[in-house]
Amino acid sequence: MASGSVGEDNALPLLEPSGEESPLPFEWTAPSLPPPDRSRLQAPLSYDPLLAPRSTSALLHLALSRQVDQGELDVERVVEQLSQGLPLESLPRRPLRTVRFGVQVLADLGVGMEPFSRDVHETVHHVRATVGREHTQVAYFDHCPVRGAGPGPRWTWGEYVPPAPGTRILILSDLGMGGPRLDARRSSRAEWERLVRTLAYAQCTAVAFVPFPEQRWPSWAAKLLPLVPWDRHTTAGWVAAHIG
């Protein structure tokens, strides 16, 4: 036999069972729960968007468009100038609202906006449908764009760079009003003031949709940039009266 092998004489004996006992039966002292009553199960709650679906497109167009004097010929002004003997150096035209300068959506993904994440994505979809995908840019950020922003995942974000001059900026954010009170990441007034200065230097105008009522808005925010209450009570008429 080869070296290192175990011979038959050295094999260990097999163990033999001495007996087998079944475990004692266990008796439950509490009655089992009844089966669920299917008739009492509630269907999942339906999704109710913050903006009324019927007025969303009109509301967004008013909030995101710019007014330019490139509409139809203003005949009344022409007649008035000629009647006063004034020369027509240019043909006066009626004001026209347009979105041809493009829109950039800045969407907040911070903890305070988590309850409104579906509304954020739905609003981005409506903006693209209203303005046109070719005229719509989307950048995401966490709490405030000055900390970094980008169109892709968080790890791809970099320093926020404003778009071309004349682009309308739509900010979807709680402006630091939501989330835990002691959250160290909460955005500050100074950060938003820095963003607005950056946009003004780039010749871009901004409007913010805020998912809180006007009573909760800090006074500095309402003075800093136009705010729109992001809820079903906001109408296109309200936007036309408050947003230039």
Feature locations, PLM:
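Hydrophobic, Leu/Ile/Phe/Ala-enriched alpha-helical segments that form helix-helix packing faces
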Residues: 63, 79-83, 123-131, 195-199
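…and closely analogous acidic/polar surface helices at protein-protein or active-site interfaces
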Residues: 101, 110-146, 188, 192
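Conserved acidic
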Residues: 108, 174
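Von Willebrand factor type A / integrin I
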Residues: 165, 175, 180-244
